[in-house]
Amino acid sequence: MVLSSYAKINLSLRINSKRKDGLHEIQSYFCLINLSDKINLKKIKEKKDKIFFKGPFSKLVNKNKNSIINLFKFLRKLKIISNYYSVSINKNIPVFGGLGGGTGNAASILKVLLKGKISKSLLNKAESIIGTDLRLFFCKQGFLSNLKNITYFRKKKLFFILVKPNIRCSTKEIYSKVRKYSKKQLLSQNKINTKNKFINVISQENNDLQSIVEKKYPIIKKLLIAIRDEKGCCFSRMTGSGSVCYGLFKDQITAKKALNKLKIKFPSFWFSFAKTV
């Protein structure tokens, strides 16, 4: 069985507070995009899982401790599965990029093993093991109003150029430097019921982690300005804790033209075109 495991983009990211358990309460508009890892999953007779990574970003994956290993341990501990599996993952999504590749891999496998029937209780438990962004991969577009709740809205067709400088961002390190917090926001459906209205709303948002990463890596700020200045770019932003930066466009042709120009300016960086799924 071959699965497509999609990347996610944080269209906005507000850090509201730090909880007693050390996690941060956040809010985020987000979407899944068609940049994906390909997962080949099959049941095996052996009494040990076989997990392989290949592709352009496979060397950066921790082979001894990762989301797939953690997921299988978790499901067996709860006696949800008893079988063992061979898993081959072609890593097309950058690692240490803020695109949620590892968490998305676990979510894709979880959906298949549980046939899409995942209770809130199980999802909450799984998130504590896999990652707090796990639930995002069960929704193609939405608004995360807090760590446990997603508000759904009508999907918008959006186009992106993605750029990753040669930087690895540690999520733990970036969050540890958060000192300022943003007010919670309320979602008003009538303000985002069209594509243009939605883009207008999110263009006025921010990623609260972006300034922290820009301070540590000045190239991020330079890159975001270069993306923003391309013709047709609605806004540029960093996703998650970085280091992938993106520009949002209303149409595919304009986005691809901008992508080709930026490739000349930053020849050593990773680039990709993407659209919402």
Where are these regions (language model features)?
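A general structural detector for well-ordered alpha-helical segments in enzyme core domains, enriched
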Residues: 25-29, 71, 126-128, 136-137, ...
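Phosphate-handling active-site elements
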Residues: 77-86, 112-130, 251-262
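Conserved glycine-rich beta-strand-loop-beta hairpin in the small C-terminal domain of fold type I
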Residues: 242-245
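DPxDG-like acidic metal-binding loop motif
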Residues: 97-126, 136
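Conserved, helical-rich catalytic subdomain that frames metal- and/or nucleotide-binding sites
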Residues: 51-53, 137-235, 248-268, 272-277
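ATP-binding N-lobe of GHMP and related small-molecule kinases
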Residues: 1-97, 115-121, 160, 164-167
